[in-house]
């Protein structure tokens, strides 16, 4: 079972896409564990609202828009990090506390890790979507993931504020996870931005070195040889 790092021109039914199935099973196990053992059910539902919509989008559009196995892996890792954070609330995450003790941090930085991962892990799938499915020029497909990461991060912070402050005041502090930092939202957006820049830089560098080829590029090289 080959592991693809670029979008294939051939459609693979979901029932025979074994990597996709493996990622789905892994995520569902983490998701179920986060639900069963959550310390704050109201916060869990708040944190997972967008997850429901995002998973629905991936499933509904699968026949038309299929990502590479690498993209599905990156998406799976990010979603697992997010729902693991929702299990305890970001501010009270055990892994964050452990890292805080080991690295002598002044706060629980698990929320910052997830925001950084939003840009770092999802920039590549976004690039695939713009380059392969929307057929945007390469330079646009490089820039848009960075711009969208910043825009979505800023929008998410506004949604967080609205939901926490207007609708669920009791869960507000836990949901926002600011831990007393008045610049928490700005730092979260910045970390997502940096993550996207690092990811696109790594992929661009690897492609320049010739280590990642799309199926079309491989076919073209075979024809020339």
Descriptions of predicted regions:
Residues 7-23:
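N-terminal membrane topogenic signal
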Residues 30, 34, 75-85, 123-124, ...:
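Alpha-helical transmembrane segments of multi-pass membrane proteins
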Residues 33-45, 56-66:
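Short, hydrophobic transmembrane alpha-helix segments
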Residues 40-44, 95-96, 110, 153, ...:
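Interfacial helix-loop-helix junctions of multi-pass membrane proteins
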Residues 43-50, 106-126, 182-197:
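Membrane-interface loop-to-helix entry segments
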Residues 53-62, 117-133, 165-171, 190-206:
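Membrane-interfacial alpha-helical segments at the cytosolic side of multi-pass membrane proteins
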Residues 134-150:
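Internal alpha-helical transmembrane segments of multi-pass membrane proteins
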Residues 182-225:
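Primarily interfacial, aromatic-capped hydrophobic alpha-helices that serve as membrane anchors
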């Amino acid at each position: 079972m080959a592991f693809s790092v670029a979008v294939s021109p051939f459609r693979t039914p979901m029932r025979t896409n074994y990597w996709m199935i493996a990622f789905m099973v892994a995520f569902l196990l983490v998701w179920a564990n986060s639900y069963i053992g959550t310390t704050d059910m109201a916060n869990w539902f708040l944190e997972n609202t967008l997850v429901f919509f995002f998973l629905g989008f991936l499933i509904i559009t699968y026949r038309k828009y299929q990502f590479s196995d690498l993209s599905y892996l990156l998406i799976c890792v990010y979603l697992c990090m997010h729902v693991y954070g929702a299990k305890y609330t970001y501010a009270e995450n055990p892994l964050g506390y452990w890292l805080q003790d080991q690295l002598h941090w002044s706060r629980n930085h698990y929320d910052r890790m997830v925001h950084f991962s939003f840009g770092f892990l999802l920039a590549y799938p976004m690039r695939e979507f713009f380059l392969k499915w929307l057929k945007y020029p390469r330079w646009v497909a490089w820039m848009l993931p960075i711009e969208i990461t910043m825009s979505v991060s800023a929008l998410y912070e506004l949604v967080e504020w609205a939901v926490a402050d207007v609708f669920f005041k009791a869960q507000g502090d836990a949901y926002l996870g600011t831990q007393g930092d008045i610049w928490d939202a700005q730092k979260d957006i910045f970390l997502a931005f940096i993550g996207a820049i690092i990811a696109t830089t790594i992929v661009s560098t690897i492609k320049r070195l010739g280590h990642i080829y799309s199926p079309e590029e491989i076919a073209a090289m075979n024809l020339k040889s």
